[in-house]
From Swiss-Prot:
Gene name per UniProt: atpA
Function: Produces ATP from ADP in the presence of a proton gradient across the membrane. The alpha chain is a regulatory subunit.
Oligomer and partners: F-type ATPases have 2 components, CF(1) - the catalytic core - and CF(0) - the membrane proton channel. CF(1) has five subunits: alpha(3), beta(3), gamma(1), delta(1), epsilon(1). CF(0) has four main subunits: a, b, b' and c.
NCBIfam families with a match to the protein in the record: atpA, PRK13343.1
Annotated site residue numbers, Required for activity: 363
Keyword annotations of the record: ATP synthesis, ATP-binding, CF(1), Chloroplast, Hydrogen ion transport, Ion transport, Membrane, Nucleotide-binding, Plastid, Thylakoid, Translocase, Transport
InterPro entries to which the protein is assigned, alphabetical: ATP_synth_asu-like_sf, ATP_synth_asu_C, ATP_synth_asu_C_sf, ATP_synth_F1_a_nt-bd_dom, ATP_synth_F1_asu, ATPase_a/bsu_AS, ATPase_F1/V1/A1_a/bsu_N, ATPase_F1/V1/A1_a/bsu_N_sf
Name of the protein: ATP synthase subunit alpha, chloroplastic
Species this protein is from: Tetradesmus obliquus (Green alga)
Length: 507
């Protein structure tokens, strides 16, 4: 190897000096002066932004929520057991983001989209901000496609459309989660991506939902996001936004999605806990003043996108728990005013054996009727009115000793129509099966049967139609209308099966 001359070395060093560009990196550091209950107060951090991610010495992340004159109030995204007074904190210059992608399907993740199902890491290339702006007016189109729940009471009288926000509200133990899970099960084979967000629930309850979905092959198109009751309130507060972010990835690729928030009462309680610990002024029921914005910015992300954006959709089914049926409490009234309708579940109906325990009289869907398929409109047009009149007559008949024949007939018809709405859990029905059941009831074919025989008869009729008259189902599925041909096929099938059912009963 030849020796370099001093001139060559000098020129080489000069060249390197000329190429060198000094890189000055400023990092904003702060010092923790108080920590506890998932909250840290920090001196310094003069340039921190609201909602910015902070990184503590031990690797724990936090979010800056309170920017005060002398300190910053931050919530911790973890237990923070190793954070002490005097620990250093640095700004990251980022807001909270999570990875998103196809590989999340069939997985169970926490509020930061980290897998918790023991199936290993989730590989993905894309990320999205947890707090994303909702689509604007120009980015949306009106709801026009149905999202079938598989429940006769909902699809016939409180129809839901893709891109709608429909509240499920009721007391504890009235079947709110059951309706949500049935809706997920009914999306099988329809290309809808489902996200189930469990907020502040027992791990055993989430495991039950997971098993229901797994047994029926619904986990393949579902993501479960969980922030259990034993997790920090920060994670319970973030979980719904994480669920919405995961669903948004699929929505913006032009696919229909369904997001269930179970339940937003617990998220509001977690946010109240955080706000009180941050010493924000309490308002009604000790909730902070921005608790309405907490839910509105979440639910406004549900939309039916315009053609230009790929016509994807996110349908939101938020769940809210009431106390003793009181829908005038703060959180229920807030969410009712944000959503496009509500399915109200009654404890009295549940205890009377009417399940799903939907109170059809006060449940409403504000935009879903535009999305209801024509076949259902044709057969279920008068169903809600008939049931409302029946409920009124039933209450009146308790005080009347003798009733005329017309009233007795109306009461008999009403009690049979109510049987049509009863459905066992995890047994969603297809549209053609629902249409057949409603048509049978509204046209008086069930009047000759005992009330207790109605459900066995309808179950048998559905099997009879599938095995012996498959062309009826094909017509309704393909045309989405109840054509004269479909009606004549159904009439004949009902008449034939009535005779068969009567013969079986007499034997």
């Amino acid at each position: 190897m030849s020796m370099r001359t001093p001139e060559e070395l000098s020129n080489l060093i000069k060249g390197l000096i000329e190429e060198y560009t000094p890189e000055v990196k400023m990092v904003d550091f702060g010092i923790v002066f108080q920590v506890g209950d998932g909250i840290a107060r920090i001196y310094g951090l003069d340039r921190v932004m609201s909602g910015e991610l902070l990184e503590f010495e031990d690797g724990t992340l936090g979010i800056a929520l309170n920017l005060e004159a002398n300190n910053v109030g931050a919530v911790l995204l973890g237990d923070g057991l190793k954070i002490t007074e005097g620990s250093r904190v640095r700004c990251t210059g980022k807001i909270a983001e999570i990875p998103v992608g196809e590989n999340y399907l069939g997985r169970v993740v926490d509020a930061l989209a980290r897998p918790v199902d023991g199936k290993g890491a989730i590989s993905t290339n894309d990320t999205r901000a947890i707090e994303s702006p909702a689509p604007g007016i120009v980015s949306r189109r009106s709801v026009y496609e149905p999202l079938q729940t598989g429940l006769v009471a909902v699809d016939a009288m409180i129809p839901i459309g893709r891109g709608q926000r429909e509240l499920i509200i009721g007391d504890r133990q009235t079947g709110k989660t059951a309706i949500a899970v049935d809706t997920i099960l009914n999306q099988k084979g329809k290309g809808v991506i489902c996200v189930y967000v469990a907020i502040g629930q027992k791990a055993s309850s989430v495991a039950q939902v997971l098993n229901s979905l797994k047994e029926r092959g619904a986990l393949d198109y579902t993501i479960i996001v969980m922030a259990n009751a034993n997790e920090p309130s920060t994670l319970q507060y973030l979980a719904p936004y994480t669920g919405a972010t995961l669903a948004e990835y699929f929505m913006y690729t032009g696919r229909p999605t369904l997001t269930i928030y179970d339940d937003l009462s617990k998220q509001a309680q977690a946010y109240r806990e955080m706000s009180l610990l941050l010493r924000r002024p309490p308002g009604r029921e000790a909730y902070p003043g921005d608790v309405f914005y907490l839910h509105s910015r979440l639910l406004e992300r549900a939309a039916k996108l315009s053609d230009a954006l790929g016509e994807g959709s996110m349908t939101a089914l938020p769940v809210v728990e009431t106390q003793e049926g009181d829908v005038s409490a703060y959180i229920p009234t807030n969410v009712i005013s944000i959503t496009d309708g509500q399915i109200f579940l009654s404890g009295d109906l549940f205890n009377a054996g009417i399940r799903p325990a939907i109170n059809v009289g006060i449940s409403v869907s504000r935009v879903g009727s535009a999305a209801q398929i024509k076949a259902m409109k044709q057969v279920a047009g008068t169903l809600k009115l008939s049931l409302a009149q029946f409920a009124e007559l039933e209450a009146f008949s308790q005080f009347a000793s003798d009733l005329d024949a017309a009233t007795q007939k109306q009461l008999a018809r009403g009690s049979r129509l109510r049987e049509i709405l009863k459905q066992p859990q995890n047994s969603p029905l297809s549209v053609e099966e629902q249409v057949a059941s409603i048509y049978t009831g509204t046209n008086g074919y069930l009047d000759s049967l005992e009330v207790l025989d109605v459900r066995p008869f309808l179950s048998g009729l559905r099997t009879y139609l599938t095995n012996n008259v498959p062309q009826y189902g094909e017509i309704v599925r393909k045309t989405n209308t109840f054509t004269p041909e479909a009606e004549s096929l159904l009439k004949k099938a009902i008449t034939d099966f009535l005779a068969e059912f009567g013969a079986t009963k007499s034997n």
